[in-house]
């Protein structure tokens, strides 16, 4: 059976986003947390700036700049720094399991600040997912792992804030446009880390530099473009369901690339986390249809 271009775009998105977690581990060797964070965003920002014209990315309105700044500060700047910091001691696959529960925090924020009523399924799903995160956090058996796991969980929280903050913007811009604006804003916020980036480019091993460029070009730039292409042509249910594949693919890539095997208890916690998110999404897919479609103005 011949697969459509949209399905192939979805496959590309899942694989590139999943491969980002082990690629971070490689990039940290030579760049460190600060250098890798800015380097990845810089590469992605340049790539998206070049592609912005052909892709029809419009200039944002001035009144939307504060919300764009919030999206950049949370979903790009803070997320990159926290995830990279956490992956210093947390295996790549384990980190992907923690990040997978980010939708939980988006739902909780919507309930608190937008007054969106949570269903029993959402409440139960949130409890299950957060319980899974707690299990993952203690799965390593030593203090450095546990501390780093909570840092990765903090990255999931700011990612949830990002998804929450994009809601009003997605009423006026495409998903790709919002991603571009946030990427560019996030890069500006991390410019104080420029010395670390320059030092990394000058001294890091070739593998670390190649991994850093890969992170910027594929997961951060091409990944957003392919995701936008796919969700504009496929059902929201299919697109959302595909994201459940990111952690399993990340686990496989991390094993093949780095030889990493996560703690068994982390896999149990990850299964709980994904199950909780699936329970939440059963009740939210209908409401997320408009916000998840990049072609919507």
From Swiss-Prot:
InterPro entries reported in the protein's UniProt record: Alkyne_AA_exporter, EamA_dom
Segments crossing the lipid bilayer: 6-26, 32-52, 65-85, 95-115, 123-143, 150-170, 178-198, 212-232, 249-269
Membrane topology: Multi-pass membrane protein
Locations listed in the record: Cell membrane
Keyword terms: Amino-acid transport, Cell membrane, Membrane, Plasmid, Repeat, Transmembrane, Transmembrane helix, Transport
Cellular component terms (Gene Ontology): plasma membrane
Span of domain EamA: 6-137, 150-281
Record keyword Membrane present: yes
An individual GO BP term: amino acid transport
Family: Belongs to the EamA transporter family.
Role noted for this protein: Probably involved in the export of terminal alkyne-containing amino acids, namely L-propargylglycine (Pra) and L-beta-ethynylserine, that are antibiotics synthesized by enzymes encoded in the same gene cluster.
Protein name per the record: Probable terminal-alkyne amino-acid exporter
Taxonomic placement: Bacteria, Bacillati, Actinomycetota, Actinomycetes, Kitasatosporales
